[in-house]
UniProtKB/Swiss-Prot annotation:
Keywords: ATP synthesis, CF(0), Chloroplast, Hydrogen ion transport, Ion transport, Membrane, Plastid, Thylakoid, Transmembrane, Transmembrane helix, Transport. It comes from the Eukaryota. F-type ATPases have 2 components, CF(1) - the catalytic core - and CF(0) - the membrane proton channel. CF(1) has five subunits: alpha(3), beta(3), gamma(1), delta(1), epsilon(1). CF(0) has four main subunits: a, b, b' and c. This is ATP synthase subunit a, chloroplastic. One of its GO terms (cellular component) is chloroplast thylakoid membrane. GO terms for molecular function: proton-transporting ATP synthase activity, rotational mechanism.
Length: 247
């Protein structure tokens, strides 16, 4: 089996998939490039919410923590425990990465249900959660792939590549393919679940009175949180796996 062309085709497929579009979209023309304005606008809003909330909560730490300080300390402790469980004792340097992934995805997912995006009128299309777009989920999955390769190479050097012939060299093609399919599974799982949730709510709102879809919206909030947790857990698990060198 020729592994290199297979790997190249997988990467090319991932690049092509990042151009998948659902519905109409609004673009900015910058030079010779078209920039996906909808995703950028909603992503900036999510980033502003995260930065603003963190700044307000911790700008003046108290000996007796305020409610906001308590909340952020709880979130940090949760992310540290998650990272330590999946990565091991060397989890420390990876807490910011895992935390950033979890918080951005969590707030992005919830923004699709809680923020009134539709009051902002665009020439084409409409605003929605950033994770409702395959371009965002691919952009989140690719740094995760780079992170676990970096973690493995930093910890084990070139010996990291020895894992591809474990437990037998016959599995070399499968082990290589597995690493290149991880970002595919991460991006499609997140994109598919968030898109499906928003579509279900839209359909129900259009078919039945506004009160009926409320339970579905609450279920969507729960599912959105679970999807953020799954993504962060898998990202940490992949990093821990690359550092330990076992499957």
């Amino acid at each position: 089996m020729n592994v290199l062309p297979c790997s190249i085709n997988t990467l090319k497929g991932l690049y092509d998939i990042s151009g998948v579009e659902v519905g109409q979209h609004f673009y900015w023309q910058i030079g010779g490039f078209q920039v996906h304005a909808q995703v950028l606008i909603t992503s900036w809003v999510v980033i502003a919410i995260l930065l603003g909330s963190a700044t307000v909560a911790v700008r003046n730490p108290q000996t007796i923590p305020t409610d906001g300080q308590n909340f952020f300390e709880y979130v940090l402790e949760f992310i540290r425990d998650l990272s330590k469980t999946q990565i091991g004792e060397e989890y420390g340097p990876w807490v910011p990465f895992i935390g950033t992934m979890f918080l951005f995805i969590f707030v992005s997912n919830w923004s699709g249900a809680l923020l009134p995006w539709k009051i902002i009128q665009l020439p084409h299309g409409e605003l929605a959660a950033p994770t409702n777009d395959i371009n965002t989920t691919v952009a989140l999955a690719l740094p995760t792939s780079v992170a676990y390769f970096y973690a493995g190479l930093t910890k084990k050097g070139l010996g990291y590549f020895g894992k591809y012939i474990q437990p037998t060299p016959i599995l070399l093609p499968i082990n290589i393919l597995e690493d290149f399919t991880k970002p595919l599974s991460l991006s499609f799982r997140l994109f598919g679940n968030i898109l499906a949730d928003e579509l279900v709510v839209v359909v129900l709102v259009s078919l039945v009175p506004s009160v009926v879809p409320i339970p579905v919206m609450f279920l969507g909030l729960f599912t959105s949180g679970i999807q953020a947790l799954i993504f962060a857990t898998l990202a940490a698990a992949y990093i821990g796996e690359s550092m330990e060198g076992h499957h």
